[in-house]
């Protein structure tokens, strides 16, 4: 008896499958994917984006994270810590790997189906063997591979965009946490100042040297300072805990986290428009992502035009029939074709849906392209405005307030003003410093947003109006 594999029909089937396999199938290499993501987001990850797949790799990550926590964590170190330590970051990388693998799977040919049957009819015994595979799937394999490649590329771009979003969140959260810590220190000074004023007013009233109205004003300042201190304390906790969550720190690691006492100094000069435009021209992820979505839709539309009409399956068959009555044996063989007939459904709605999806992707690409320049202009304007405001506080407002404080100190020493005037001026000076801290915070938030905008992932930054300086309303005696 001849083997089924020697039947010409089977040879043809196996030849077609072999050709399809040799033609190449879509595949995903995790290391190459991460290398590409690091190349696209080098200014954000410094090439340290990596997925731990073994216990040894996880231990190495934890050791590196622990080493970073032994010193004060700056903004750059915070990003490194998130890349090394955050389970959410690792989950994002693993999910991207899964999405790319599923995209690659869609570009591969389905496995053939082998069927075996045994039938007895009287004295006849028949064994049937059928090898079936999707003929249309085989014919359209190059198209499906092209779609899979586009989906893999789309997944890689999406990964880069998510990495930029995540690192930008870490940068901005670090800025808020440090600014909140710095503001809390000055809020404590205001509170201590107001507390001293309220206590002095109470004692002066007790000996008849202060009226009730003046004492009530000092007590009001003290109560307001206590409220502001509580709010600043809660704001510092919230900002720090937000950063802890983004870094993926556990309780022990959170206890080790040390942040700087103040924000970094402003750069000597703001970035110039020409420099920003040059950096932005190197490629925007939002446009790349929209373009890849259009490419996927366009290729899928061409394939759906064929698949929506019909489906074809080819089966190669070889049977063995034993006739016990005559003692003979026969080996009928042949093939069968399964064809789905488009009688009730011609696939018009599926084709319309694909056409609409492609049209939507094309218009989305146009919308993203048109909005790109607007987002960049807005981000740069916010950056430059925040820089100018912060520099104005540093170079003008704070020095002027210090000069006023120095002059009032001299006047107090000469007994030209009382202690309450001096305390009120001290409160105003601290309030000015806190406004300067807020201005620096706005700048560094805008700086992080601008860096994200250069690659097409703006987060949006609003510049808060500076609060008007409030005098302590000093009362003499």
Regions found by a protein language model. Give the residues of each.
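Small/polar, glycine/serine/threonine/aspartate-rich low-complexity segments that form flexible
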Residues: 61-71, 112-145, 258-270, 301-302, ...
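Short, charged, amphipathic alpha-helical segments
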Residues: 93, 146-149, 212-221, 419-427
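Short segments within alpha-helical structural elements
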Residues: 195, 224-252, 398-456
